[in-house]
């Protein structure tokens, strides 16, 4: 969304097209890992990418190094973390269809290929430096890092994106830092004062909102409940974009088509206020986690299906009646004539 300014639903349509043209594997998946069966044949996928010019050299490099042969023993392969389908990867086939792809679709395909090939290259290495300097009783702190080895970063950099510039430091400066010891006296060449202000959190765009929905458990303080919802989140990979689309259709949020920035509408804020002051728990991810825990209890026989259903029915009835009793008056508000459910 941030890179191409397209919505999650448009992204899914593009990846669906790539799938139908046999360029990538099944797109409607939450998985971030591969299956053991796929790992055994992964060399075919890599070898096929030698026919895709933007990543041909990196595919050849992965084949030459042979790192793919041990992929089954890495964190990228885990059958237990796969429910229906493994992660989206390029098939290494279907290149005849590349000519029929729109420019954006071709770029999305390149991203998938580069992300896939990156796992067969070493990690990027940085050197972190933290210094505490003392002068006349005042302490000054300096923290920075510099790149030692690019590793996979040279593979993941897209051909169509501006490369992120890493801070440049002279070799002399780096060598001098390596020799600095506690208690050393350093001469100050210059001092520069910079003034700044803290910035508010950035607004969600459609892409970052999808990721937040996927990782909703991060907002839960209770460790047991946080673990309960881990890997679940709000919705699924096949429904999250639909949830956002429905919120927009109901006029609860506004989605800027050019920037993909998501903004709550006046109606959306009203709905939020009503829920906040009546059923506050619905706004918290730990409620969803507790429901998931209850469902797990049913599955494990710790609680009967009837008992769980009764608890849910009582909860919904109680708080629905509470909402009905709230006196609310908003003027100058035009409500949508039809809400999607």
Where are these regions (language model features)?
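Eukaryotic nuclear/nucleolar intrinsically disordered, charge-dense low-complexity regions
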Residues: 21-24
């Amino acid at each position: 969304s941030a890179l191409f300014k397209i919505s999650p639903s448009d992204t899914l349509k593009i990846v669906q097209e790539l799938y139908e043209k046999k360029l990538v594997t099944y797109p409607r998946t939450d998985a971030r890992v591969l299956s053991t069966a796929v790992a055994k044949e992964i060399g075919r996928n890599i070898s096929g990418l030698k026919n895709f010019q933007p990543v041909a050299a990196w595919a050849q490099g992965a084949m030459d190094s042979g790192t793919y042969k041990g992929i089954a023993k890495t964190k990228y392969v885990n059958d237990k973390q796969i429910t229906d389908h493994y992660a989206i990867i390029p098939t290494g086939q279907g290149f005849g269809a590349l000519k029929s792809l729109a420019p954006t679709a071709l770029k999305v395909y390149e991203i998938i290929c580069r992300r896939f090939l990156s796992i067969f290259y070493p990690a990027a290495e940085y050197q972190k430096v933290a210094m505490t300097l003392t002068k006349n009783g005042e302490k000054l702190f300096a923290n920075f890092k510099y790149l030692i080895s690019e590793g996979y970063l040279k593979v993941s950099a897209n051909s169509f994106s501006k490369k992120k510039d890493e801070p440049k430091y002279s070799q002399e400066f780096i060598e001098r830092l390596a020799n600095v010891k506690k208690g050393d006296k350093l001469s100050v060449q210059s001092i520069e004062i910079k003034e700044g202000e803290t910035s508010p959190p950035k607004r969600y765009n459609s892409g970052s909102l999808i990721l937040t929905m996927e990782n909703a458990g991060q907002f839960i303080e209770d460790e047991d409940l946080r673990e309960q919802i881990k890997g679940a989140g709000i919705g699924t990979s096949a429904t999250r974009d639909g949830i956002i689309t429905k919120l927009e259709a109901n006029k609860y949020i506004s989605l800027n088509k050019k920037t993909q920035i998501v903004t709550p509408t006046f109606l959306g804020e009203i709905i939020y206020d009503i829920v906040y002051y009546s059923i506050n728990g619905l706004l918290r991810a730990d409620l969803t986690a507790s429901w998931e825990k209850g469902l797990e209890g049913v599955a494990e026989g710790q609680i009967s299906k009837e008992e769980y259903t009764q608890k849910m029915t009582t909860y919904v009835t109680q708080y629905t009646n509470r909402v009905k009793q709230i006196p609310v008056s908003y003027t100058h508000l035009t409500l949508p004539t039809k809400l999607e459910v």
